[in-house]
């Protein structure tokens, strides 16, 4: 099993063989949890491997409903972050805006990286990602002092 395209095609085949709306089952395919637990016995037709695409892994495990919910979460978080960055114009210093933009840029990099790696499976990465999201949103609430 070499190459991402073969892995992605295998994942999509498995999704459509199971339930496309609800998926194959959380933690049962394409990632670290599935590799460690091995709930399903491996044979010639099925073997465990890393999906190397977190969004596609989410689609296969949770179906179209789960992927749509996850994308809504990420888009909503991104919109809130952009709104907070826009509100940093009201801050006393430009440093707040630079910090907010820098944190959001890092988050965008992680979201793009998820197309090529299961980066969200790493607990530290998830903690850093959602902490950065919270920090960006918080920075949008700083205000200039009234005189």
What are the residue ranges of the model-derived segments?
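Hydrophobic transmembrane alpha-helices and their immediate junctions
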Residues: 61-111
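Generic recognition of well-ordered alpha-helical segments
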Residues: 7-10, 54, 58, 77-80, ...
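Generic hydrophobic alpha-helical membrane-span motif
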Residues: 29-31, 58, 69-72, 123
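Long extracytoplasmic/lumenal interhelical loops at the membrane interface
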Residues: 1-10, 17-62, 85-88
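Extended hydrophobic-aromatic, low-complexity segments
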Residues: 21-25, 67-69, 121
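Transmembrane alpha-helices of multi-pass inner-membrane enzymes
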Residues: 101-147
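Hydrophobic membrane-targeting alpha-helices
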Residues: 2, 14, 20, 77-84, ...
